[in-house]
Curated annotation (Swiss-Prot):
Transmembrane segments: none annotated. This is Profilin-1. The keyword Disulfide bond applies. Its main location: cytoplasm. Disulfide bonds join C95-C117. It is found in: Cytoplasm, Cytoskeleton. One of its GO terms (molecular function) is actin monomer binding.
């Protein structure tokens, strides 16, 4: 299965039969390379991805400044050090799950709830972890 298929079928999917979808999604390598992304994923700057990688390696780096992706600023909220970063921006937000070799990104806006985004992103991340990825 291609990485693009994971994005299209497992991240940009209908969430629990609600007809709702994430706004955008992507899978990156832990080195910052893009493995696959939705067409709607924001144009990002390399330093934005570098800051996310640094946060996974040294939790607490983004809380004072916020997480930036595609120029949008997300307020960093609770996550799991070294494993999950969650951010909020207005009625939407972001969830990023780190596995051994990948980072799974999900971005949402209303009517999708934070917990729905977290479930979609973390479920794929946990599956990849189980597969040794």
């Amino acid at each position: 299965m291609s990485w693009q298929t994971y994005v299209d079928d497992h991240l940009m999917c209908d969430i629990e039969g609600t007809g709702q979808h994430l706004t955008s999604a992507a899978i990156f390598g832990t080195d910052g390379t893009v493995w696959a992304k939705s067409a709607s994923f924001p144009e990002f700057k390399p330093n934005e991805i570098d800051a996310i990688i640094k946060e996974f390696n040294e939790a607490g780096q983004l809380a004072p400044t916020g997480l930036f992706l595609g120029g949008a600023k997300y307020m960093v909220i609770q996550g799991e050090a070294g494993a999950v970063i969650r951010g909020k921006k207005g009625a939407g937000g972001i969830c990023i799950k780190k596995t051994g070799q990948a980072m799974v990104f999900g971005i949402y806006d209303e009517p999708v709830a934070p917990g729905q985004c977290n479930m979609v992103v973390e479920r794929l991340g946990d599956y990849l972890l189980d597969q040794g990825m």
